[in-house]
Amino acid sequence: MSFLNQLKSQASALQSEKEAQNSRFDSNTQITESTAKSVALYVTDLAKQLNVIAPAGPKLTLDGKTPWPAMKMLDFRSDARKKTLRDREVYDYIGMGWSLLPVFGQPVGGSVSANFPPDLQRIEERLSAGGVKHERISVRHPEKNTLQAVRFDYTTQARGSLTITPDHDAGKLNFRLANVQGFGVVNLSYPVDRVQTALLDELAKMLIGQPSTFV
């Protein structure tokens, strides 16, 4: 076989592989988009129902020692955005956000301190995850001026969220849950054939603190 024929053979194999890959991508995109549409409708309806119910929120603490008051979930809002993928309009993400506020009365002020890096990092991550308004204050020795601790003065008001991002090429949905079972973020993925009403019901149960097999 001449060298040119070898190149032709190599090009033909690559072309066949590319066509098979494109066919697989198109199939995955179609299935994923259909699933994403169903999920968007579910999330929109879920937000409406939860706005009426205003379920109890998770137990919250920034340092693991200082509990927040009993919280409730309210002001649920759903959203969905689209993008263009291979000349086709598809879902970019599906989301729902909500407020976490005290069950009784208005948000109140609180304070936590840390003087070890791991504790400091944990508190900062939780403040960031919850979108908690706060002020960071360095506590120093009155005479030596050495740093003794870092204090965070905060208000007991936070945000929770659910973001679902379709991966059309891989045929899966990526779920990001923020502040659902306390401060923190959970990320996980499910293939689209697993994302049925039963799974979404388990997700809804998890969001409002009921026993769930979603994670």
Residue ranges and their predicted role:
Residues 1-215:
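A composition-biased, non-transmembrane "mature-region" signal
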